[in-house]
């Protein structure tokens, strides 16, 4: 039994749905007081701050499972305060205060090293809106940084994620189906009509 290719109307509907989802996700992320990006190994956060702030005016705390960035003082503005979705390596993580050419004039740049360098984060802190990590396509340069075995595992994970998303079998499921088909071909005398597979 062969599966039909999706019609152009189906593809157009999926594409429109995806654009709408992406626009909603971007709108949610735009409301955050910071911007963030990630690779499979780390997360970078930038927080625009007032040009008159100095490093000593800031209270930046990076722990294994949480982050807090605020202006010092009892009523100091809090930029981010919450739990990470996954642990970081505090000793490998850092922050700097940098001058920028665009207003408000400075930004806090935070670099977080992930403990598990094989997973994507859906958000920086668990109270923030999530992004759809299944839509992340890492740059080839970051994949090429990985050793052969790790790269193969990441590519397999990405393939399996896309397959699940489309309702198609993962690489492991496909391999099992291929083995079963081969076995059925080699043993036509066996009746598989009542077999429960899965």
From Swiss-Prot:
<keyword id="KW-0132">Cell division</keyword>
<dbReference type="InterPro" id="IPR007052">
    <property type="entry name" value="CS_dom"/>
</dbReference>
<feature type="region of interest" description="Disordered">
    <location>
        <begin position="1"/>
        <end position="29"/>
    </location>
</feature>
<feature type="modified residue" description="Phosphoserine">
    <location>
        <position position="193"/>
    </location>
</feature>
<dbReference type="Pfam" id="PF04969">
    <property type="entry name" value="CS"/>
</dbReference>
<keyword id="KW-0493">Microtubule</keyword>
<feature type="domain" description="CS">
    <location>
        <begin position="29"/>
        <end position="125"/>
    </location>
</feature>
<dbReference type="GO" id="GO:0000741">
    <property type="term" value="P:karyogamy"/>
</dbReference>
<dbReference type="GO" id="GO:0030473">
    <property type="term" value="P:nuclear migration along microtubule"/>
</dbReference>
<dbReference type="GO" id="GO:0005874">
    <property type="term" value="C:microtubule"/>
</dbReference>
<keyword id="KW-0498">Mitosis</keyword>
<keyword id="KW-0415">Karyogamy</keyword>
<feature type="compositionally biased region" description="Basic and acidic residues">
    <location>
        <begin position="12"/>
        <end position="25"/>
    </location>
</feature>
<feature type="modified residue" description="Phosphoserine">
    <location>
        <position position="141"/>
    </location>
</feature>
<comment type="function">
    <text>Required for nuclear movement. May interact between microtubules and nuclei and/or may be involved in the generation of force used to move nuclei during interphase.</text>
</comment>
<protein>
    <recommendedName>
        <fullName>Nuclear movement protein nudC</fullName>
    </recommendedName>
</protein>
<dbReference type="InterPro" id="IPR037898">
    <property type="entry name" value="NudC_fam"/>
</dbReference>
<dbReference type="GO" id="GO:0051082">
    <property type="term" value="F:unfolded protein binding"/>
</dbReference>
<dbReference type="InterPro" id="IPR008978">
    <property type="entry name" value="HSP20-like_chaperone"/>
</dbReference>
<dbReference type="GO" id="GO:0005737">
    <property type="term" value="C:cytoplasm"/>
</dbReference>
<keyword id="KW-0131">Cell cycle</keyword>
<keyword id="KW-0963">Cytoplasm</keyword>
<comment type="similarity">
    <text>Belongs to the nudC family.</text>
</comment>
<keyword id="KW-0597">Phosphoprotein</keyword>
<keyword id="KW-0206">Cytoskeleton</keyword>
<dbReference type="GO" id="GO:0006457">
    <property type="term" value="P:protein folding"/>
</dbReference>
<dbReference type="GO" id="GO:0031505">
    <property type="term" value="P:fungal-type cell wall organization"/>
</dbReference>
<dbReference type="GO" id="GO:0051301">
    <property type="term" value="P:cell division"/>
</dbReference>
